[in-house]
Regions:
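A short Gly-Trp-Pro
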Residues: 1-16, 21-142
Length: 142
């Protein structure tokens, strides 16, 4: 998920699914750390996590096209486009008042410095506190 090492400047970035039905905008700082999670769903989908506070996420269109999938604890709300099947964002259990946006689904301007770090999602409960300090400034929840 994403942490902010120290950048002040905020940028508005567009994102969405492959077919274009789901579109959103996010506001992010100039420096971000994105996590590559090793849990089963992230590993199989190639998801790169960027946690964005709900106040910095704006769904422009496609909400009616989203299909929700929950597993294990049932807390995380995985949202897939019902047309193309892409998960461009979802509501993570670590930050239920935020969104995890897939870096691969965002148009990132050249001014953004992106660092990708590994996260041991196979042992999520043991490592979840390492996700604290995201763009939301919140701590993780179960």
């Amino acid at each position: 998920m994403a942490t902010v090492p120290g950048g002040d400047s905020m940028f508005t970035c567009s994102g969405g699914c492959h077919c274009g039905r789901v579109k959103f905008e996010i506001e992010i700082p100039s420096e971000i750390i994105v996590h590559r999670c090793s849990c089963s769903i992230c590993r199989k989908s190639g998801y790169l996590h960027l946690i964005v506070a709900a106040s910095r996420f704006n769904l422009l269109c496609g909400g009616e096209d989203l299909i929700e999938y929950r597993f294990h604890t049932g807390v995380a709300r995985h949202l897939f486009c019902g047309v193309c099947g892409i998960k461009s964002y979802y509501v993570p259990r670590s930050h239920p008042d935020s969104f995890s946006v897939n870096l691969n689904c965002i148009d990132i301007p050249g001014e953004i410095d992106v660092t990708i770090e590994a996260f041991d999602g196979r042992n999520w409960s043991k490592n979840r506190d390492k996700l604290a300090g995201s763009l939301t400034g919140e701590t993780c929840s179960d």
